[in-house]
Amino acid sequence: NEVLSANIDLNIDRISVNSSPRPYEVLFKDNVFSFIEKGMDHKEFSYVFFIDENIASLYEEETKFMKNYPYKSFHAIEELKNVDAAFDVCDLLLESNANRKTILYVIGGGVMQDIGAYAAATYKRGIPWVYVPTTLLGQSDSCVGGKTGLNYKHTKNLIALFSAPRQVLIDPKFISTLNSV
């Protein structure tokens, strides 16, 4: 068997996405939580965190800095992906006096992305948000394109819109526990 090869640089650290709401970059970062914390030196912005409760628990030490900011952990299951959850995030943003110079970090899989992106897009007609996908599907599919939808009246993604993130941060450690194929 002959192996075909090509000159492909597999050491890419970013991909540009030309999305219709707005272009954005997907960055590949090891130790993403440390990267986020170091990037918070920009005093012209304020920060809010919306994180999957499982990720908050598994990475408790790495994410503890987030609790110094407005913070909400969430039980991310499909049955809770609804307008009430999005309004809970809007309440967090309102209580935080969030504005267009506030960055909402959404950390988790597709359920978190849908809820957080919807809240960010509709709160005060839109604030910037950054997505940190922690599932294989989140890292390979849902982080590209900006689709977001909430379930309503037993219908999946009935209430939907496009809301591209300002940035996507992918850390391969989140999928390192997957079984070998």
Task: Annotate each language-model stretch with its function.
Residues 110:
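Acidic-aromatic/histidine active-site loop/patch
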Residues 113:
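Catalytic nucleophile loop
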